[in-house]
């Protein structure tokens, strides 16, 4: 994965970093890697837009490994799958569960940012989006999304954004 992380392709590099973090966060916590294998297969199904198959595998993980550390990643992947299908409220529900049950985990700030983005750009609920962005700023000050979040808050407030900030 280190070679992929150094790739010049931003998307490939970001995907490699995301995968590396997910593996580091969940690998080796138990000696049974079946849940990780099922998760990987479900992730592939999402990429192939085979959502029912993916969700079936996610359900199998939840049933067979109810306290596995992949639980927050499963919610995140479900939310992303809902976004791919244009099911914005369902995506928001999954993101909300991440914040509610895994608020201090690595995906909490991602879930808040994605929620605010959906509220702002897909559902045109600017006040709720603004509140969600503010929550991200206060609860996750070290987030990688801080710079973009500040820009969006200023824009939603109607403040002037300098050219270099765009």
State each model region's role.
Residues 1-166:
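Acidic, polar-rich low-complexity tracts and alpha-helical solenoid repeat scaffolds
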């Amino acid at each position: 994965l280190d070679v992929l992380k150094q790739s010049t392709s931003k998307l490939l590099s970001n995907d490699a970093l995301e995968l590396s973090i997910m593996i580091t966060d969940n690998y080796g916590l138990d000696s049974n890697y079946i849940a990780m294998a099922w998760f990987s297969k479900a992730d592939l199904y999402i990429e192939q837009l085979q959502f029912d198959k993916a969700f079936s595998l996610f359900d199998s993980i939840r049933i067979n490994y109810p306290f596995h550390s992949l639980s927050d990643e499963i919610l995140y992947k479900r939310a992303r799958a809902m976004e791919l299908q244009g099911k914005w409220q369902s995506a928001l529900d999954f993101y909300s569960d991440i914040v509610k049950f895994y608020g201090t985990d690595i995906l909490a700030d991602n879930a808040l940012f994605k929620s605010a983005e959906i509220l702002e750009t897909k559902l045109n609920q600017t006040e709720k989006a603004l509140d969600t962005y503010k929550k991200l700023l206060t609860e996750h000050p070290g987030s990688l999304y801080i710079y973009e979040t500040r820009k969006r808050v200023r824009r939603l407030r109607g403040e002037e954004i300098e050219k270099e900030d765009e």
